[in-house]
Amino acid sequence: MQNLRRVFLWTLLVASSHGVWAHNHASEDAELLDLDGLTAAFGWDFDSTEIVTEKVADGLYVLFGVGGNIGVSLGKDGVLIVDNQFPQVMNKIEAAISDIGGKGVDYAVNTHWHFDHAEGNNALGPEGTTIVAHKNARIDMASGGTINLCLLYTSDAADDRSC
């Protein structure tokens, strides 16, 4: 029984290490996409994007649009959002916040540095919004970190892999 466990664990380790290797090496020859290329790949259209609001509790909402969702807290100290999508839809996001009683965005918390969660910083920062992020997320945002999407496949793209 002890040997069977060892064989199982060894097999699991070897099988999972291939995915780690692929993640670390897949982007060496892959073409990097800019934001326009990524939005086209995901089928996102900022112009036709609608922001949908859902109330979670008094003063607490979630906004759905394109990419990551946005948490919104309305309180006596102002409006706090968690994640902020893209500058191209910020006017729609701010309109949705206004519709629920907020005025502007006072604080934006970034959960992480991915473009669909933090790219809106580029619109909010110049407006005076206080932006909060973990120091590692800040480093990745400042360095223009690359997201390896080579392991992300949809049924439509499974036969057309470029990674």
Give the positions of each predicted feature:
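Bacterial N-terminal signal peptides
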Residues: 10-17
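Metallo-beta-lactamase
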Residues: 106-116, 137
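Bacterial N-terminal signal peptides that target proteins for export
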Residues: 1-8
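Conserved beta-strand hairpin/beta-sheet module of binuclear metal-dependent hydrolase folds
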Residues: 52-96
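Surface-exposed loop and adjacent secondary-structure segments within mature catalytic domains
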Residues: 131-150
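Conserved small/polar residues in nucleotide/adenosyl-binding loops
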Residues: 153-158
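Metal-dependent catalytic neighborhoods of phosphoester/phosphodiester hydrolases
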Residues: 118-127
